Amino acid sequence: MTAQLIDGKAIAANLRQQIAQRVTERRQQGLRVPGLAVILVGTDPASQVYVAHKRKDCEEVGFLSQAYDLPADTSQDELLALIDRLNDDPAIDGILVQLPLPAHLDASLLLERIHPDKDVDGFHPYNIGRLAQRMPLLRPCTPKGIMTLLASTGADLYGMDAVVVGASNIVGRPMALELLLGGCTVTVTHRFTRDLAAHVSRADLVVVAAGKPGLVKGEWIKEGAIVIDVGINRQADGRLVGDVEYDVAARRASWITPVPGGVGPMTRACLLENTLHAAEHLHD
């Protein structure tokens, strides 16, 4: 068996096109365009690249984009005051604080200061709680994007044994909630899991988000399983690789995401989708 590729780049491009069309319709109806504020603290190179991509995405779909590039020594109180101002700004539908933050800043406190209706990353405890109670509002972008990728395969998730490798607040935990909502029987593995191979090898669907290149061996993948690789790791030779041993896994899986070009583009597209949703359903 050779796996079919889940082309996140193409699916994300289609989603951006739909969002841009809706923004055009809003303009024609005399409605304001959605607004996204992006806060970057410090000069972390990877964060600067991610933020540049997000701003480019906003321009592509016609959003209002406000950039706040702040020095690394910005204080907690200064950031809280900025978030308060953006919470009160009617032109802004979404507020994004780029992670990671400098060590002196409390990320949890800052993210919780964002009004839940403007939490387009979907990290606020209120939005995670809504997802847990099967009433999602603004959903975490990466898990939401993965559900869109899974839908593109046409696979029926109901009753599938799904294994999530990694239990972070950003991907693993909300991913488990999304899969539960999708009808899967879900197992979450983490760094204390004793026999990772045993869990992965029985899974109909594997979502790997551990940040460790090649952690999941291709031979562990069950024949015909769906493999979603969230990991993106730069090797010494400059190559980007995922958390799954791709070449072997692709010979066993029915569907697999490439790295790069799989999950990453969908995360960005879902940030735009959340911002549009906030504008249309929470703020208009």
Swiss-Prot record:
Where, by residue number, does NADP(+) bind?
G166, A167, S168, I232
Q: What reaction does this enzyme carry out catalytically?
A: (6R)-5,10-methylene-5,6,7,8-tetrahydrofolate + NADP(+) = (6R)-5,10-methenyltetrahydrofolate + NADPH; (6R)-5,10-methenyltetrahydrofolate + H2O = (6R)-10-formyltetrahydrofolate + H(+)
- Oxidoreductase as a keyword of this entry, yes or no, is yes
Q: Lipoprotein among the record's keywords?
A: no
Pfam families assigned to the protein according to its UniProt record, in alphabetical order: THF_DHG_CYH, THF_DHG_CYH_C
* Listed InterPro entries: Aminoacid_DH-like_N_sf, NAD(P)-bd_dom_sf, THF_DH/CycHdrlase, THF_DH/CycHdrlase_cat_dom, THF_DH/CycHdrlase_CS, THF_DH/CycHdrlase_NAD-bd_dom
Q: Which GO terms describe its cellular component?
A: cytosol
Q: In which pathway does it act?
A: One-carbon metabolism; tetrahydrofolate interconversion
SUPFAM superfamilies in the record: Aminoacid dehydrogenase-like, N-terminal domain, NAD(P)-binding Rossmann-fold domains
A biological process (GO) of this protein is:
L-histidine biosynthetic process
Record keywords, A-Z: Amino-acid biosynthesis, Histidine biosynthesis, Hydrolase, Methionine biosynthesis, Multifunctional enzyme, NADP, One-carbon metabolism, Oxidoreductase, Purine biosynthesis
- Gene Ontology MF: a single term: methenyltetrahydrofolate cyclohydrolase activity
Give the coiled coil ranges: none
Query: What Enzyme Commission number(s) apply to this enzyme?
Result: 1.5.1.5, 3.5.4.9
**HAMAP family this protein is in?**
THF_DHG_CYH
Q: How does it assemble?
A: Homodimer.
Q: What does this protein do?
A: Catalyzes the oxidation of 5,10-methylenetetrahydrofolate to 5,10-methenyltetrahydrofolate and then the hydrolysis of 5,10-methenyltetrahydrofolate to 10-formyltetrahydrofolate.
The record's family statement is: Belongs to the tetrahydrofolate dehydrogenase/cyclohydrolase family.
Name the record gives this protein:
Bifunctional protein FolD
Question: What organism is the protein native to?
Answer: Pseudomonas paraeruginosa (strain DSM 24068 / PA7)
